[in-house]
Amino acid sequence: MIKLKDISFTYENSREGESQLRHVDLRVEKGELVILAGRSGCGKTTLTRVLNGLCPQFYPGKLTGGYLLDGQDALKMPVHQLGTMVGSVFQDPRSQFFTTNTTDEIVLGMENIPLEQSVMQQRVKAVCSQMNIQRLLDRRIFPLSSGEKQLIAIASICAMEPKIIVMDEPSANLDSDAMVRLGVLLYRLKEAGHTILLSEHHFHYVCASFDRLIFMENGEISSIYSRNEALSLTEAQLAAMGLRPFQPSSFQVGGAFLSKPEDIFQVSQISCMLDGRQILEDVTFSAQSGKILSIAGPNGAGKSTLCRAITGLYRSMGTVRIDGEYLKRKQRAKKSFFVQQDADYQLYAPTVVDEFLIGKKESPELRQAALARLCEMGLEPFADRHPASLSGGQKQRLLLALAAESGRNLLVFDEPTSGLDGYNLRLTVKLLRHLASMGKSLLLITHDMDLIAEAADCVLYLEQGKLRYHRNVLRDK
């Protein structure tokens, strides 16, 4: 079905000798589900872009080697022909939307095939039922949460039923239930004969259905494991490879979190409406200095909206106090640092190191501090690179470093580890713990059970815009 022979690719304007893919040989048969694994920046996303034709037709660069798709030379195919054979779900779902309505978006690809209206209606009903997203039909796309957008992107591609489906971290922003449903959907597609390539850091939701795991390092395929071989790898072996365990960490919550008058951060009766919908309703909680609060809940529960409201990015009802002082919206924005889910919104400078110098008077000491922070997050080799050239996981780590260097006492992170491998997850946990030890108050919006288990002191759970519980995390001493 797919045959890559000696594929190498170098992006335009890359440094001399710097290739993103090096001599990749890979054969994938019809009906296989293959995981592409490896540390952030190892070349997984670039490989998916070669498979769907975006490299070099959309991302300019030098591509060498051979690529056969169903026996045809894919490198000579018109992009529209390749697009009918290979369906893609990108790392950032926003980059593949063409409409503003969810139902229109799911239908659009089928209209371009084209399919009969009755067939399209049947497929929309089937895929939305399998993914449990009927509630998202006929909604405006822009107000949706990142996880809900990801679900729409997945549904739009799966409804087309292409021969080959290439997904780049499709579970990054999904809650645990949605991940399970995605795993079931991929299993059904695989059983129906579709070929699936999955670039992922989270493996548990496809444990029962994947056939092989392709491990990449520095743009090369380092190892290929059968399903049994991959599942036999110990946690220590996976950690040495920079990968996460095949099963997510578990944790227990204890009694209710008890607020204290001296809590550094106090939120009272926050309510918010967006696009005519009640997103938050009377949310009240507090956080302590030196503690890490995880904000959890299903996709669309209002987690990101809550954090945008309390950091002053959204208008809302209710009050927020920091260090005992009531703060208006603009004051809250100055007192806090909010790391958004979409890293591109917060990166403006021409180089990575220059991100630390925005709005500051440059000095050797400031530059040295920035380089030290980059080194801490494994980003020092990219100091002079443009931020847009980084991988998704590298951009996330850059924003974590910027938050750490901001000097703010309230740090809020929206899915800070969604695109991170096991190695960089551990780096992130170490940094978060260090920031907490300095007396800062940290809020983490996350679906990542590994992050909650390793870093969180307490969990605040939202559902349908309401606070369901706020409890301490029980951890073995």
Region annotations inferred by a language model:
Residues G66-Q81, T319-R332:
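ABC ATPase NBD Q-loop/coupling interface
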Residues S118-L136, E365-F382:
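Conserved ABC ATPase "signature" region
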Residues R140-L144, E148, H386-L390, Q394:
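Conserved ABC ATPase signature
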Residues I154-A155, L400:
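Hydrophobic anchor residue at the start of the ABC signature
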Residues C158, A403-A404:
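ABC ATPase C-loop
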Residues I165-D168, L411-D414:
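Catalytic Walker B motif of ABC-type/P-loop ATPase nucleotide-binding domains
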Residues D175, D421:
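ABC-family nucleotide-binding domains
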Residues E200-H201, T446-H447:
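H-loop/switch region of ABC-family ATPase nucleotide-binding domains
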